[in-house]
Design a protein with these regions (language model features):
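Membrane-integral, polyisoprenol-dependent glycosyltransferases
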Residues: 2-306, 313, 326, 331-332
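Short, composition-biased linear "edge" segments at structural boundaries
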Residues: 313-323
């Protein structure tokens, strides 16, 4: 074998056979639609968000309220999440009169969850196409082709998201939390695709950072945007692309500055850690520990053996690649 890659993975072409697209799309449809269609708002957060949307959509005349300061029964939104409520209110206003208003309000959130799945697939695909992620090249051929290998990795990433997303977050509620998830994933897609499709990635990064800030998480938008720019600045694998990478970093930082100015003008800065949120983090951590049992103790025992030291040494360049660190930076 000719070891032209820093990744020690040995993958033959037969191991990355194409998963039929209709199967993958069927899984996605089966995940997205049942949770949104044929139900009424089912939890306090879901009902509260629908109340803000309905109030915005129906307010007129002397009862007109400010779309920049949504309120419900005289109480302002504690999350300061404008964009999710705007989307729901616009959907209610534009929907046919025969359509139930709660279903109409959920339509944009069906789109946001679909965007989450699509951005995940294309973001993972872009990272899997990078040289650091490619498997070993065989001396006499037969190794996995880059496009097929990346597609298999992206399929696995999307299926893993479908399997685990419900554990970490209720993704079928028309709330600002789903909008935050969607825009965070869109930012992951944008940063992963900057070396390949710059214009589309620039636009996606701008939409993601602004959308995340207007969905009740401006501080998180700044952390993810600046963190992503920092990771790109550390990437020295292609010195010839230094100038283009510098432009990309400057663009992301400029978006963050413009978004910070917009959020300041609207008075939307929020940064608080409530005790209930700490308890939620503890519960999620405990749940993930049990969900991954016994994979994580097996992984620890495998990496502790002497025979694994050479493997980890050969994997070091790929693992420490800035692009490989990007998904971990964007995990919330």
């Amino acid at each position: 074998m000719s070891d032209t890659s820093s990744n020690p993975a040995i993958v033959a072409q037969g191991a990355v056979r194409r998963l039929p697209r209709w199967v993958l799309l069927s899984f996605c449809l089966a995940y997205v639609l049942p949770g949104f269609v044929g139900r009424t708002p089912w939890k306090a957060d879901d009902m509260e968000a629908f109340g803000f949307m309905l109030h915005l959509a129906q307010a007129m005349g002397p009862e007109t309220i400010s779309w920049l300061k949504p309120s419900l029964l005289g109480q302002a939104d504690p999350l300061a999440a404008l964009l999710p409520y705007w989307l729901g209110a616009w959907a209610i206003q534009l929907s046919p009169s025969a359509m139930p208003m709660d279903l109409a309000a959920r339509l944009p959130f069906i789109g946001l969850l679909t965007l989450t799945l699509a951005a995940t697939w294309y973001g993972v695909y872009a990272l899997a196409r990078t040289p650091a992620a490619q498997p070993v090249t065989f001396a006499f051929g037969g190794e996995a082709r880059p496009a097929d290998y990346a597609r298999a990795i992206a399929d696995g990433g999307l299926l893993a998201l479908l399997a685990c997303l419900g554990l970490a977050r209720l993704s079928h509620e028309a709330t600002p939390a789903l909008a935050q998830l969607s825009f965070s994933t869109l930012l992951f897609f944008a940063l992963a695709n900057l070396p390949r499709k710059r214009i589309g990635a620039w636009v996606s990064a701008a939409i993601a950072i602004v959308g995340l800030a207007l969905s009740g998480a401006p501080a998180l938008a700044m952390i993810l945007g600046i963190g992503g720019a920092f990771i790109m600045a550390l990437d020295t694998h292609k010195p010839s692309a230094l100038r283009a990478r510098s432009v990309d970093v400057a663009w992301v930082l400029l978006i963050c500055l413009a978004t910070a100015a917009l959020v300041s003008a609207l008075g939307l800065w929020r940064w608080r850690v409530a005790y209930s949120h700490v308890l939620e983090i503890k519960a999620i951590t405990r749940l993930l520990l049990w969900f991954t049992w016994p994979a994580w103790p097996t992984r620890i025992s495998a990496t502790a053996t002497p025979s694994s030291s050479a493997l980890w040494a050969s994997m070091a360049p790929a693992i420490t690649s800035p692009m490989a660190k990007m998904p971990g930076t964007l995990v919330r």
